[in-house]
């Protein structure tokens, strides 16, 4: 029988051999990428309407059919080396604009200061090459320690030695300006963010040409009237923030006042004396001086030249040697070892007081260049990036606050002085700025009703209430407690008597403490903080008949006590004792009440609660088991580069209450914003943060699983919204599924932003907007679901609203109900008798992260055996774990 098959049988070939141990590849299931939800139809309607003004300025646009052309910029020295120094690029490109206007087709460009420029319409060619020459700075061959002038080129003006620069401009892309026209109609398109970036670069270039310091989207003029000294040789410099924003009403320019920290310009020695609080340089800590001066710029009084500081000399000016190429009578050079002081004597330059102090070094490690400190002046507008002290922070807040009329006047003047409408690139773009504040309509939401002791209703007035002649909602008993005293000036007998009296008036049964106040042994007052704490606990153990359940700790200083961290660690981690630290300056009823509010909350009591928590007022929260979550990540202060980030998540407990919270805190990689420990499967178990909180809710809520999970996330920018949804929310969903595969709770995710620049002003008066003012139209996002809420009464400066973004809402809240819930959660903050500016769960997460940051000492963390967190990835620096709270306090509001 004939067949076309190779084997002649007419059958298909046999299947290939499959090994028995072969595991088939399964294509991973692709997850749907979540995006921020769209705004529901219609805005909220509850509340009394109020006319407002906002610091958004309208934008007109008359060139919808054009294009922004994007060009790459390469700047090289004449010998082909790339120019890498910051700052010089703008001078070079300004020279190109000035010299080659005709070659540029009479076009103006917007340059970002680095490697990009934009034009309106195309340049004559896709690739243009130019050469420019800048003014030459006089040689510095005679400066001590470097006769070849390498140090002159340390900062942005260094290339002036070579004078000539080669500039290459090449086409990269084009951006349709139609994107801006669409934004004016409230529509977002693919190219909108690129187009807005061009407009922002135009404004930055305008500020740079006025000699401003640029910090992201803020700019600061070199005007002493804008400098506000805050101590320590540091000043707050007031400037302006500006950015283009898309809104429901179209495109707007958001302008606000902004402040950055700068070093005190002038003699270096004056700055150091102020920075270290010294009367003369002989008591100076020169190691500290070296750290604070590094990379700052100085002007040399002998030549008016500028340099960047690389360090200090190892020896004093009179002892520091360097090799001087000294000219002789024959016009030749001979190398001579000489001290810096004698070098200046040889040059007949008097050094008055610097001989005993280190020199300023502006050279390279192998080629130092030294100047006596008295010849060095710090140039103006240099950012101070170290951590501020508590005193500096307080001074900054005090001196930079502006009442609404003052802020409005400042913004009006700033916009006028900037004169944006005269900018040639902005004119070419067809963009013009309306100089009037935008009018918007707000609503004042009804004030939520509170419940206090004996079931009594309490209605806050203007965002405030008090407990005068009232008791707390759930007062506790303070028993088996003691007073420990690290302060030598506190009248402890009066404090104890008044605290007991005030507590009983508020319904708290404060029993008498153990008989003796435990005072610190004076001989330990100058010992290290950990030694002082250990000694205090030795006294507690020997003097008290039983272990205490609560300790009231009196500190000498409220914010600067080095005892605070070790004390908290000993109590919360090692022993599980609830503690409250105080540093009383005056004992009055208000102070004692505030202390008792914290004590009551930490011991499991409840000071006040929302009336809706015990009523069916909001069925989606009070009729269905609901957990409310607050999340924040703390990254430490500027200058603390070796400190890990701290992630804190708090959650409500004892449903239907939404006023009590438990915290879970872990460390994670430095500067990582997304929380990576929410779901953490290890050996078949979930050791993540969210599981811990879900189990606490279950056991504290009579074995109920939450059917609704409402998440408030703090501290993320709009560019991170997708990560919140697709990383953090996904982890929480996985944690739920891991606990019970059949359990499918519904989620709502809301981001709370405080770090923005939108402000509101009453159009009919000088006061701040009333508490409860909400804005959800006109200047809100054209597509996404967001609103601004001023829940609190702004008593100082201008009220900063919180900007809430609803990213996800499976629960399906009506707009009014969701806004009412957010507003109400500003009234459950147990430490205060005022509405706060952001929902309480977010505040609690921030407090928990901050408190655990003080509990741990970075260098001790790796030695902690009972701990949480701790990540080690190949090639990464291990993250030290967070000490685990003692079981006695793990569910308490220890952070309150």
Curated annotation (Swiss-Prot):
GO terms for biological process: defense response to virus; megasporocyte differentiation; megasporogenesis; plant ovule development; regulation of translation; regulatory ncRNA-mediated gene silencing. Residues 267-380 form the PAZ domain. The keyword DNA damage does not apply. Disruption phenotype: Differentiation of multiple gametic cells able to initiate gametogenesis. Abnormally enlarged sub-epidermal cells in developing ovules. The keyword Ribonucleoprotein applies. Expressed in embryonic shoot apex region, pollen and developing ovules. One of its GO terms (cellular component) is ribonucleoprotein complex. Residues 550-857 form the Piwi domain. Keywords: Plant defense, Repressor, Ribonucleoprotein, RNA-binding, RNA-mediated gene silencing, Transcription, Transcription regulation, Translation regulation. One of its GO terms (molecular function) is siRNA binding. PROSITE patterns: PAZ, PIWI. Belongs to the argonaute family. Ago subfamily. Involved in RNA-mediated post-transcriptional gene silencing (PTGS). Main component of the RNA-induced silencing complex (RISC) that binds to a short guide RNA such as a microRNA (miRNA) or small interfering RNA (siRNA). RISC uses the mature miRNA or siRNA as a guide for slicer-directed cleavage of homologous mRNAs to repress gene expression. Associates preferentially with small RNAs of 24 nucleotide in length with a 5' terminal adenosine. Interacts with 24 nucleotide sRNAs derived from transposable elements (TEs). This is Protein argonaute 9.
